[in-house]
Amino acid sequence: IFPALPANAAIITIPSLFEPTGEEAASMDWVSTPATLHCAPLGWPGIRSAMHQMTSWFHRADPALLICDVSAEVAQLARICSVPHVKILQHGDRSDPGHRAAYDGAAGLLAPFHSDLAQPEWDDAMRSKTFFAGGLGVDLRVAEREVARQRIGIDPDEELILILSGGGGEGFGQAPLGVGARTCPSARWITIGKVQRDWHATEPGNIEHRGWVDNADDYVAAADLVISSTGNTTCQQILAAAKPWLAIPEWRYFDEQHRKADALAAAGVATTLRHLPSSAHGWTSAISETWTRHRPDRQR
């Protein structure tokens, strides 16, 4: 997942903080988790090993800064070990004591999105220590539509509706997508990423599932309209391409994608629904609204 690294950079692999090894002591599960922590089960040797590796590295390397992605526990560990940290700021209801401790104890907050997508409850104190870095970690160069279509095998004059589902969840359901494709028979529907298979789905011939691809950016550049979830990378790619966009949040911890969808709607850069339309008339309305509300100048 990393590009070529410079000579002074190294990758240190640590055990998973979330996946069991089979050596966990389930007899300790009766002890409740305090409000200041999220994922801190007792009796997990993998967690002890990971924390040991990190604290040992803190001692050896004497780091000037740690950039912490999603773990409030690791952020608090850095602070306890006298290591300054910058915490990645994500959308969601993160008003709980665990997140607040990670944010309040941080030297700064790094938001991988534009400031227009900030949540309204983030106060001045929080925003004053936040650096908004839209496009962080994503190649936002957008191929010409015709070039992108050649790469993915789509004719220049075809209407293409792209359904993009990331890797953090189970993907969209096959049945509602089939209803949507039947509603727009003149368009070619292509899905990339995960799709939940439904035995009762009656798909028409104009929908195609391509699964995981290495060039999702080409598909976005080639599309006339995009339907997707609201993960960070997905959002940045679609906004950079300034496509008509129907955004459907998936389940994530702390309602991350739902709050991201709220922010996208408030900024006027996407049409959002809480779930995929469940009927032909629902799809007709959603797609019409997506075209009508498209504001490419706002997206860029």
Where are these regions (language model features)?
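Conserved nucleotide-sugar phosphate-binding/catalytic loop shared by glycosyltransferases and other
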Residues: 1-46
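Short, polar loop motifs at secondary-structure junctions
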Residues: 1-3, 70-73, 114-118, 191-199
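Conserved nucleotide-sugar donor-binding subdomain of glycosyltransferases
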Residues: 30-75
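Alpha-helix C-terminal capping/helix-to-coil transition sites in glycosyltransferase folds
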Residues: 60-62, 105, 221-222
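A donor-sugar binding/catalytic signature common to diverse glycosyltransferases
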Residues: 65-70, 88, 216-259
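Active-site-proximal region of nucleotide-activated glycan assembly enzymes
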Residues: 80-143
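Donor-nucleotide binding loops and adjacent catalytic segments primarily
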Residues: 147-225, 276-277
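Conserved donor-nucleotide binding/catalytic region of nucleotide-linked donor-dependent transferases
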Residues: 271, 276-299
